[in-house]
Amino acid sequence: MAYIRLLRRYTVKHLSHWKLWKFTFVIFIFLIFVFLLQREVGIQDFNEEPGSPSKDGKINNVLGLVLKAVNNIKVAKPKMQIKAPIRQTQKAGQKRCLPGSYTAAELTPHLDRPPQDSNAPGASGKPFKTVNLSPAEKKEKEHGDEKHCFNAFASDRISLHRDLGPDTRPPECIEQKFKRCPPLPTTSVIIVFHNEAWSTLLRTVHSVMYTSPAILLKEIILVDDASVDEYLQDKLDDYVKQFQIVKVVRQKERKGLITARLLGASIATGETLTFLDAHCECFYGWLEPLLARIAENNTRVVSPDISSIDLNTFEFMKPSPYGQNHNRGNFDWGLSFGWESLPEHEGKRRKDETYPIKTPTFAGGLFSISKDYFYKVGSYDEEMEIWGGENIEMSFRVWQCGGQLEIIPCSVVGHVFRSKSPHTFPKGTQVITRNQVRLAEVWMDEYKYIFYRRNTEATKIVKQKTFGDLSKRYELKQQLQCKNFTWYLSNVYPEAYVPDLNPPLYGFIKNVGRRTCLDAGENNNGGKPLIMYTCHGLGGNQYFEYSAHHEIRHNIQKELCLHALAGEAQLHDCDYKGKNSRTPPEEKWELREDQSLYNAALKMCLTGNKEHPSLVPCNPSDVFQKWIFGRNN
């Protein structure tokens, strides 16, 4: 109590002091005011001139000075009262978002899948086996196989609504949360088709609606690239009318995948574009992981982990809950796309299955991209025709111009991989080579000559300059300040083996005695003997390079080397792969002055006197041991 009384006495004392000080201050200000007022108005009237301020105006000036002085003193006083905070206004174009993560209820699919019959054909992604067929059924199956290059008979008997069984992705994928800030962008799914089977096309559409959150799926755009099948006309239009988000747009003449996708993108209203082929099935939770990566950085171009749907049984190869050995995209020097295992450093970087895979190239059939970035980075090369090479072109362009390509393992989409295309090319398959020349000219710098040596058709197009106008693509490259191809090989794909830019010898290898050429034979991916075949000068199976490391390389798709064995010579994977590798003696060849190909490890020479070239004791007078390198046509 004594403490409280003391505190009260102290407070009263200081308050009285404050009141006294305040009264003194007011008197002081008043005296200043009177002094200034007297000084201003006490001036003789004869000093006034026309246009000078009146007495009232002078008095107002003095009052203004006094008030400013008082206000300055007030501002200098400590502020004891706390004001309310000023609400920050939202920036224009900035989307509102709530904290935390999306709930399962928020990510409810656009459409509920109907009840499933576990015994139905192909249920839960199981295979459908076509056995004990009647003559009519066999005829139907054969027709479908020929028309679509997959078992349309099986597909037609599997429900358009089939589910794929339990979610077998790794636990970290199933439990993955997606932040509300920044919000996941909406997407327009674009599906191009040309004479597609009814069941595969509509199963793709239904699959998207059954697995894509309603708040993210803006629309599904079906782009018809001049199909002639009657069931893809009015019947399709009538069928999709039941779904407000499904649109059908048509090209009256066959222009190909590239033009059709550009048409779909031009009418899309989603913030992102998701391209799918017309024979896919989407697994659970496929869309959110793709869009989450774009939400974080809109220069990412992201692909799902593509699973296989068997072309004969339509079995869906489901992901493993324990993770799996993933692949990434690559390219060969014939500019074809391929798959390869992840390098060790990429495997170490990824802690679990939620981590993306950085990929040098992508397949190009299934991917998502920000719509704004799609156009900023150059969409597609509009002068490329039909199909082919556009995925390699976009891969090089995205990386070299500041973007990234990723494969997202938690996003799984099944795809029917066909062994051959059922479609014809209106201008022939040379349009693919023309497309490849366009990408090589713009993005590969001096490395384009590696491709030209392997493709005589490409060399012809370059000489005749029939690849079209490239000025817009060069302008884009300059505008985006894109890096060169050396940078790409050093920073994006350092694992790539780069052949000699100027090999000592290249072309076909002709045997003097038989007047036939060394030929890799069909489907020789290594481990098979070579053959002797009529020289055609078109490259391909008869293209070889004599490298600076004294190898004889056949490197159109894989890097294969002529391997010396007792008996028939074979092509094997080349041991020399660049840095930290060497050329083994069995792969070193000496082209001697007598035109023989000599292997020092076996101390033998290559002969072409039989169907398969082989190694025999050297004989300088044997014409079957003499070889000539020649340039392809």
Residue ranges and their predicted role:
Residues 289-290, 361, 365-368, 372-378, ...:
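A short, conserved alpha-helix in the catalytic core of glycosyltransferases
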Residues 281, 285-339, 404:
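Conserved donor NDP-sugar-binding/catalytic core segment of glycosyltransferases
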Residues 209-250:
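Acidic donor-binding segment of Leloir-type glycosyltransferases
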Residues 258, 333-368, 376:
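A recurrent flexible, glycine/aromatic-enriched loop bordering the glycosyltransferase active site
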Residues 185-190, 219, 393:
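Cell-envelope/extracellular polymer assembly enzymes that use nucleotide-activated donors
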Residues 495-633:
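Lectin-like carbohydrate-binding module/patch detector with strong preference for beta-trefoil
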Residues 2-75:
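N-terminal signal-anchor transmembrane helix specifying type II single-pass membrane topology
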Residues 209, 262-272:
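Active-site nucleotide-sugar/metal-binding loop of Leloir-type enzymes
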